Amino acid sequence: MFNDHLAGAGNALTGIVGMAPEARPWANFVTMQLLVVAIIVVLFAILRPRLSPDRPGKLQHTFELVYGFLHEQAEEQIGHEGHHYLAFFGTIFIFILFANLIGVVPGFEAPTMVPSVPAGCAIAAFFYYNIVGVQANGLGRYLAHFAGPMPLLAPLMIPIELVSHMARPLSLTIRLFANMYAGEQVTMVFLKLTFLFVPAVFMGLHVFVSFLQAYIFMLLTMMYVAGAVAHEH
């Protein structure tokens, strides 16, 4: 879509910064990500000046419900300090949710259908929970938990823990990518084979899966953070 209509402008921009653009420099999933970010920024720009504790609008009510839900989940998974990490949880949840839902719009495709996008989110979550784990416990205590509770078991536990932690980004990536890709393909197949009301059912299912996968990704990230910041280390 972008390359069909705005490739010339894209080439000009990449030329200004000294890059040598290819014939089609903008992949669809890149432009979809940028569009998702732009939509989120515009929504918050609209919401910010309209915030009111006395007369909240529908958009404010919606985001207050989302905030309350995220806060409750963070407190449940991490404890009383869970609210300290809400900024990251909220960012990852809202981005993945909007990235999933944009695929419902005709002519658009969800960027989470491309493995590199879920992988980017998973890598961000991986680095985040390790960083906050070090901040909460100190580098020495955080690394010590990889050895397990007994020094004699350290040669066995360290490889197991390392493999377990390295598998987490892969698990997050495959789960999000596979579910979104499969849902999109099922919707497209039925859209081509049947009347409109039948694909509408699958589009509703696609919306449900979009919310569910964003929630699961966020919930697993919360669990990883909870394990990383636990003071039993």
From Swiss-Prot:
It holds the Pfam family ATP-synt_A. The chain crosses the membrane at residues 27-47, 85-105, 114-134, 143-163, 189-209, 210-230. It is a multi-pass membrane protein. GO terms for molecular function: proton-transporting ATP synthase activity, rotational mechanism. It comes from the Bacteria. GO terms for biological process: proton motive force-driven plasma membrane ATP synthesis. Belongs to the ATPase A chain family. This is ATP synthase subunit a. The lineage of its organism: Bacteria, Pseudomonadati, Acidobacteriota, Terriglobia, Bryobacterales.
